[in-house]
């Protein structure tokens, strides 16, 4: 599938992936211009695609980065208890610089609420993981491990959880691990 191709981790395909996402963004923007949207999942999807699109260059981050949060906020206007939107806006607050509103305190608040509002196993799984990783950074290891164990009970033998535990054993949260391996960080260091 296209999504599997986009998310296979092979950065050598970056140009093609960026083009696919860019074309999809144009279609979404055109659809939004011509239709009244009142669906929380639509806004989450638009925000997710925008986030993926901007993950290929610092220029795109600067251009699109601040457009993501309002999309998740719009989703939460339609469904204030949508765990998926809460988890993702929490990630936005985590990665955004303070100058544009980023805040670990807000991240924690959104992750806690996402966990409270999680209904499906998938929502619980990701809410547990993301909250655990913020707690890992705050050195709240007991609660972090408890949440990871809860995620493992939902999805035993998960390779994703194995990767997270491995990162944690190296002293890195999932967020720190992802930032460390991001090609964007390498690109931004070239600019500095």
Which residue stretches match the model-derived regions?
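Alpha-helical junction/boundary sensor with strong preference for TPR arrays
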Residues: 25-28, 32-35, 72, 79, ...
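Short coil/turn linker motifs that delimit alpha-helical repeat modules in TPR/alpha-solenoid proteins
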Residues: 35, 57-64, 78, 100-103, ...
């Amino acid at each position: 599938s296209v999504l599997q191709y986009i998310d296979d981790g092979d950065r050598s395909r970056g140009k093609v992936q960026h083009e696919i996402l860019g074309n999809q963004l144009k279609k979404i923007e055109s659809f939004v211009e011509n239709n009244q949207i009142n669906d929380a999942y639509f806004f989450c999807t638009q925000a997710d695609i925008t986030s993926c699109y901007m993950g290929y260059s610092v220029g795109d981050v600067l251009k699109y980065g601040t457009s993501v949060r309002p999309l998740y906020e719009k989703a939460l206007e339609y469904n204030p208890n949508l765990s998926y939107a809460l988890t993702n806006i929490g990630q936005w607050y985590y990665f955004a610089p303070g100058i544009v509103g980023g805040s670990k305190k807000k991240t924690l608040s959104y992750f806690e609420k996402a966990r409270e509002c999680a209904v499906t196993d998938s929502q619980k799984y990701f809410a547990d993981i993301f909250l655990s990783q913020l707690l890992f950074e705050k050195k709240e290891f007991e609660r972090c491990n408890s949440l990871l164990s809860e995620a493992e009970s939902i999805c035993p033998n998960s390779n994703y959880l194995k990767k997270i535990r491995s990162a944690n054993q190296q002293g890195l949260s999932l967020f720190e691990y992802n930032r460390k391996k991001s090609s964007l960080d390498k690109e931004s260091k070239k600019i500095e």
